[in-house]
Amino acid sequence: MSSLTMQVTKRLETFLQGTKKLYIDGKFVPSASGATFDTPNPATGETLMTLYEAQAADVDKAVKAARKAFDQGEWRTMSPASRSRLMYKLADLMEEHKTELAQLETLDNGKPINETTNGDIPLAIEHMRYYAGWCTKITGQTIPVSGAYFNYTRHEPVGVVGQIIPWNFPLLMAMWKMGAALATGCTIVLKPAEQTPLSALYLAELIDQAGFPAGVINIIPGFGEDAGEALTNHEAVDKIAFTGSTEIGKKIMSTAAKSIKRVTLELGGKSPNILLPDANLKKAIPGALNGVMFNQGQVCCAGSRVFIHKDQYDEVVDEMASYAESLRQGAGLHKDTQIGPLVSKEQHERVLSYIQKGKDEGAKAVTGGSCPFEAGYFVAPTVFANVEDEMTIAKEEIFGPVLTAIPYETVDEVIERANHSEYGLAAGLWTENVKQAHYIADRLQAGTVWVNCYNVFDAASPFGGYKQSGLGREMGSYALDNYTEVKSVWVNLED
């Protein structure tokens, strides 16, 4: 164990021992093949843990357990109030173990401990509690139909759901999906990302302690091309929920179409963040920069296309570069770290290749673009100037700490250019003019628009994308629709 992992609690030290098992049908079991894989510490590149690798046979076992729990188990007949109590109990256990969960997320993903302690983990707990409250509030309608009939609707659970979780917010994204599925009465097979599986396996221990019936929640770490594909292909899975790249989302959608599975997709983005001439620059500059650099830029809705009015362009770019240079980089467990490493060697190489492509196409790296440390997967916060709309770094999702500064002249022009993207996940704008804010927000093609803020979330507010940024919505009451079927019941009232 590296020195960085020695800073963790005793309880987490215990968890980090041995080879971690899959959680299937209420039991911790090795993979059927005995295959294992390692997950590294992004701050050092050293192996953090070894885990059993779920493959097709393990996926089949997990799906069958979930199918049995849904079709025959006590979960199906459990009252909504009882289901709610189990979810609240899990949230309470997460609260009790919040320090371990925060440290584990930082070790596995690399993100700063201040972010996991004050952001990821509290939000994950909030989501579980939010959806626990929904268990008793899912209702249908009585509909005044013609004739001597009584007609009503029921919202019934869709069944067994496969949930494929990304590596950028591992536990939080799991809660986005798991909370809504449990509230509606579905059973779950959850595949965490192979890069960051540990918080999901720690969660499995808490699920076990909470007393969920066997088979209701199954957690199977493995690789997308094997476990993920087997889960998407499985005929006994009724729905797939996926967060990740648009490229993989398209493949999942195609595979799910073979059996007409329900699908929700939260995919990529290349979000615009517009600074209007009247913006409060003391707030807008750090706000827009953090809208890109948060979580090392590994955020699907990162505001990586920053549009700046041409009259303020040079001044704002210089200030953004200075602010970027002030951000402290280091290992996530160091409390003064503001920017941690990228999640993996592959992601590190991907981001560096985009930076080089930006330079090759004529953009100017005002700051950053380098690797500040010899060890680990670090990239210095990078600000590009002289960026044009058709450059690769202005069109494609980089998923790293790279800001592209783009000049504009008029409001209608910048709206058109902001919308000129295959993505439509989110957008931001900074202005002191409320009328202007509503005018622009109405015209931006994005599932979320932030005004004078960025990356603000709440469990009650929906999140999802237009265009190739996805299908359906996560969070809020809207997410419940993803996990229910609507049944219309007609009763003849004639004698």
UniProtKB/Swiss-Prot annotation:
Disruption phenotype: No effect on vanillin degradation.
InterPro entries given in the database record: Ald_DH/histidinol_DH, Ald_DH_C, Ald_DH_CS_GLU, Ald_DH_N, Aldehyde_DH_dom, Aldehyde_DH_NAD(P)
Domain of life of the source: Bacteria
Keywords annotated in UniProt: NAD, Oxidoreductase
Residues that bind NAD(+): 244-249
Catalytic activity: an aldehyde + NAD(+) + H2O = a carboxylate + NADH + 2 H(+)
EC number: 1.2.1.3
MF term (GO), any: aldehyde dehydrogenase (NAD+) activity
SUPFAM superfamilies: ALDH-like
GO BP annotations, alphabetical order: aldehyde metabolic process
Pfam family, one: Aldedh
Parts forming coiled coils: none
Active site: 266, 300
Enzyme type, top EC level: oxidoreductase
Membership in a protein family: Belongs to the aldehyde dehydrogenase family.
PANTHER family for the chain: ALDEHYDE DEHYDROGENASE-RELATED
Name this protein carries in UniProt: Putative aldehyde dehydrogenase DhaS
Species: Bacillus subtilis (strain 168)
Gene: dhaS
